[in-house]
Amino acid sequence: MESTQEFQVPLKTIRLTDGTEYQSYHTEGSLSDKKPSDYKNGIPKIRKEWIRTRLDRGDTNHSQMYYAKKGIITEEMRYVALRENMNPEFVRLEIACGRAILPSNRNHPELEPMIIGRNFLVKINANIGNSALGSSIEEEVEKLHWAVKWGADTVMDLSTGKNIHETREWILRNSPVPIGTVPIYQALEKVKGKAGNLNIQVFLDTLEERAEQGVDYFTIHAGVLLRYIPFTANRVTGIVSRGGSILAKWCLAHHKENFLYTHFDEIIKVMKKYGVSFSLGDGLRPGSIADANDKAQFGELETLGELTKRAWEEDIQVMIEGPGHVPMHLIKENVDLQMKLCQEAPFYTLGPLVTDIAPGYDHITSAIGAAMIGWFGMAMLCYVTPKEHLGLPDKEDVKQGVIAYKIAAHAADLAKGHPGAIKRDNLLSKARFEFRWEDQFALSLDPETAKSFHDETLPQDRMKTAHFCSMCGPHFCSMNLTQELRKFAQEKGMEEKSEVTICNRKKESGK
């Protein structure tokens, strides 16, 4: 743990057999010591005193953007600066200009602050939540624990089944990471599933209920406007967002503009009161690569840019949700247009999936797009599991989705040249070349799987120091042969001779 006088920032320390130590970003935090039997008690409220000071002072806007614009570096900002190895003033400036957000509801004191922005580490979100057809409260909290264990930076509770309020309460009291939700789901439940009966008061009541519990960011589909809906008529897959389809149905039923758009200022008031961040939803995102980058998608994106400005005028943090299903050659256009229309507000994308032909493997089809869009400047990736399009994910699906997206996020960090991103790669490569098998496992994103694959054929302890694996055996390992070659060259003075030969050739060629 790295500490200041006021708080400790969670870090995972990996101790290698050569004496080297590597410290990595750690999302599990205080939840790592929890057992399922302890979930009712929740985790420590590390922000309790910070929040109390602001309440005692009479603050009415609890958004981190509000404080950042005033030149105040909050405890949350300093916490984030430690986690990211950044200067606290740089963190404040990125939040103040809207290029990054620090989701942190004042009623989520258990939160261990993190930041989402293209100039920071690429983050990943994991979705959990029950449906009408399965999953208990305990199972959802266990999914939360499982997701952050493997590296989820935020978690969205998308529950649509029974006990939504209680499920969310358990999740929040046990979450060290920001929790996001989609309030329109519960609002629809309150009107017995009839979209036409929705209204702004039902929605605001739902919003207040969730904000009071401590939800850190809301997906609000306020950009689904009446005039954009006809653009989806000739799509291959129509409207694939649940929230988008609900609001499109309401608009057509009443032939009126989306009530979330017309009452956006009232929604802002709730966000301001609790410090909740907007995740402006892409209700018209493409659900197939054939529909990518069409009028409906980009029309909505333009409206999200307008709404971003309105939220910023009230010092409310905003990130923008994005697609979806986009072939590789169209991905960069999405990022460039989003940055232009939304003034560089953080981009938060679902993949995108780069092909539609792989049900059961969409964690792979989407991780390809995720790595690319992360490289181009996206700030947070929403994971996709192998069950995407097929069913409700279980624990193993959650793990597979998180790991696939940790790989994509790290690949993007490497491509962007994020300070320190390559250190872990170099340590693992060195351990691999030196046949330090235990260190290779420890430095892996998934040590358990790496070790189990190795031990399937070479389980003996002595094989943890062997200079080969089952792929090549003892006589054909290229790295072992390279080591022998280097040793031979060193003994025969070949390095010096090689340098002399190169110098002579350069002289002969006149270089």
Swiss-Prot record:
<dbReference type="InterPro" id="IPR037509">
    <property type="entry name" value="ThiC"/>
</dbReference>
<dbReference type="GO" id="GO:0005829">
    <property type="term" value="C:cytosol"/>
</dbReference>
<dbReference type="GO" id="GO:0016830">
    <property type="term" value="F:carbon-carbon lyase activity"/>
</dbReference>
<feature type="binding site">
    <location>
        <position position="127"/>
    </location>
    <ligand>
        <name>substrate</name>
    </ligand>
</feature>
<feature type="binding site">
    <location>
        <position position="389"/>
    </location>
    <ligand>
        <name>Zn(2+)</name>
    </ligand>
</feature>
<feature type="binding site">
    <location>
        <position position="185"/>
    </location>
    <ligand>
        <name>substrate</name>
    </ligand>
</feature>
<feature type="binding site">
    <location>
        <position position="321"/>
    </location>
    <ligand>
        <name>substrate</name>
    </ligand>
</feature>
<keyword id="KW-0784">Thiamine biosynthesis</keyword>
<comment type="similarity">
    <text>Belongs to the ThiC family.</text>
</comment>
<feature type="binding site">
    <location>
        <position position="477"/>
    </location>
    <ligand>
        <name>[4Fe-4S] cluster</name>
    </ligand>
</feature>
<feature type="binding site">
    <location>
        <position position="221"/>
    </location>
    <ligand>
        <name>substrate</name>
    </ligand>
</feature>
<dbReference type="InterPro" id="IPR002817">
    <property type="entry name" value="ThiC/BzaA/B"/>
</dbReference>
<feature type="binding site">
    <location>
        <position position="156"/>
    </location>
    <ligand>
        <name>substrate</name>
    </ligand>
</feature>
<comment type="function">
    <text>Catalyzes the synthesis of the hydroxymethylpyrimidine phosphate (HMP-P) moiety of thiamine from aminoimidazole ribotide (AIR) in a radical S-adenosyl-L-methionine (SAM)-dependent reaction.</text>
</comment>
<dbReference type="InterPro" id="IPR038521">
    <property type="entry name" value="ThiC/Bza_core_dom"/>
</dbReference>
<keyword id="KW-0479">Metal-binding</keyword>
<dbReference type="GO" id="GO:0009229">
    <property type="term" value="P:thiamine diphosphate biosynthetic process"/>
</dbReference>
<protein>
    <recommendedName>
        <fullName>Phosphomethylpyrimidine synthase</fullName>
        <ecNumber>4.1.99.17</ecNumber>
    </recommendedName>
</protein>
<feature type="binding site">
    <location>
        <begin position="282"/>
        <end position="285"/>
    </location>
    <ligand>
        <name>substrate</name>
    </ligand>
</feature>
<keyword id="KW-0456">Lyase</keyword>
<keyword id="KW-0862">Zinc</keyword>
<feature type="binding site">
    <location>
        <position position="348"/>
    </location>
    <ligand>
        <name>substrate</name>
    </ligand>
</feature>
<dbReference type="GO" id="GO:0051539">
    <property type="term" value="F:4 iron, 4 sulfur cluster binding"/>
</dbReference>
<feature type="binding site">
    <location>
        <position position="325"/>
    </location>
    <ligand>
        <name>Zn(2+)</name>
    </ligand>
</feature>
<dbReference type="GO" id="GO:0008270">
    <property type="term" value="F:zinc ion binding"/>
</dbReference>
<dbReference type="GO" id="GO:0009228">
    <property type="term" value="P:thiamine biosynthetic process"/>
</dbReference>
<feature type="binding site">
    <location>
        <begin position="241"/>
        <end position="243"/>
    </location>
    <ligand>
        <name>substrate</name>
    </ligand>
</feature>
<comment type="pathway">
    <text>Cofactor biosynthesis; thiamine diphosphate biosynthesis.</text>
</comment>
<feature type="region of interest" description="Disordered">
    <location>
        <begin position="492"/>
        <end position="511"/>
    </location>
</feature>
<keyword id="KW-0411">Iron-sulfur</keyword>
<keyword id="KW-0408">Iron</keyword>
<feature type="binding site">
    <location>
        <position position="472"/>
    </location>
    <ligand>
        <name>[4Fe-4S] cluster</name>
    </ligand>
</feature>
<feature type="binding site">
    <location>
        <position position="469"/>
    </location>
    <ligand>
        <name>[4Fe-4S] cluster</name>
    </ligand>
</feature>
<keyword id="KW-0004">4Fe-4S</keyword>
<keyword id="KW-0949">S-adenosyl-L-methionine</keyword>
<dbReference type="Pfam" id="PF01964">
    <property type="entry name" value="ThiC_Rad_SAM"/>
</dbReference>
